[in-house]
Amino acid sequence: MSQRYRGRFAPSPTGPLHLGSLVTALASWLDARAHGGDWLVRIEDIDYPRCVRDADNDILRTLDALGLHPDEPPVWQSRREGLYAEALRQLDAAGYLYPCGCTRKEIADSLVHVRERHQTLGYPGTCRNGLHGKLPRAWRVRVPDGPAATICFDDRWQGRQCQNLETELGDFVLRRADGLWAYQLAVVVDDAAQGITHIVRGADLLDSTPRQIHLEHLLGLPTPDYLHVPVVVNAVGEKLSKQSGAQALDASAPLDALRTAGTHLGIVNQETTVAAWLATATGQWLERLRAVQDLRGTPPSSAATGRLGA
């Protein structure tokens, strides 16, 4: 891409920053700094019931203590709902949306093989051609049929990734039955509005990426480069998260936290101050990426493919 690098860290304020989220924050910060780019912070707080009071400010204070300073003031998704409404209107006007009256139980009952990915049940298309007497609950976006349903992209860490949206997922929700905006729509709209060129995040979001690329295509938005770092897991192999009991970072020991997070990314140095550690780690980052890409045969930048359905 010819434009200036712009990256971001986009935490959900469901609790304090922990090691797993720090690994993602650090990776995105290092990638931005190593490329001479800008690094932004966006608070993804549209799922109001899951948000914890003042967790957003706690996250920002912790990032500041760790020396991870954004280049622009943070933004909050809850203050940007007009952008999501306009994107939904645009998709609806183009004929890509339809109302859905199905409950999660009805969807599960209609599937022969129930499959759940990130708490999203595969959708069999029950309401694609009409509500059949049901009341509208949510808004879904159509996915392409046939060969066009396969979306592929080259991830700078994980390598080539492909997903068939039709067979693996189905038409997916953009506005939920409770009136809240779906993550997939909000993140695509915000990344475009903020001019994000490179997305660095955890590998647990790998299978969200084809959905986001599909939405980027439908909305006529640019597709960023993607890099998904391995997630940190606990002693039983579960992703380290607030839900799995991850401990809050100790902001009074920032160097220890950075060293631990760096180790998970393959970044190790012996610097004794936060500023010096981050400066050295920035130089090490591109070497680490080259080593990963050489091992996986991954190209240095990603290219997304996939055609729009008729």
Curated annotation (Swiss-Prot):
Q: Where is this motif: 'KMSKS' region?
A: 239-243
Q: What does this protein do?
A: Catalyzes the tRNA-independent activation of glutamate in presence of ATP and the subsequent transfer of glutamate onto a tRNA(Asp). Glutamate is transferred on the 2-amino-5-(4,5-dihydroxy-2-cyclopenten-1-yl) moiety of the queuosine in the wobble position of the QUC anticodon.
Tell me yes or no: is Lyase among this UniProt entry's keywords: no
What family does the Swiss-Prot or TrEMBL record give for this protein?
A: Belongs to the class-I aminoacyl-tRNA synthetase family. GluQ subfamily.
Top-rank taxon of the source lineage equals Bacteria
Q: State one molecular function term (GO).
A: ATP binding
* Gene3D superfamilies documented for this protein: HUPs
At which positions is motif 'HIGH' region? 11-21
**The keyword DNA-binding appears for this protein:** no
Protein name stated in the entry = Glutamyl-Q tRNA(Asp) synthetase
Q: How is the cofactor bound?
A: Binds 1 zinc ion per subunit.
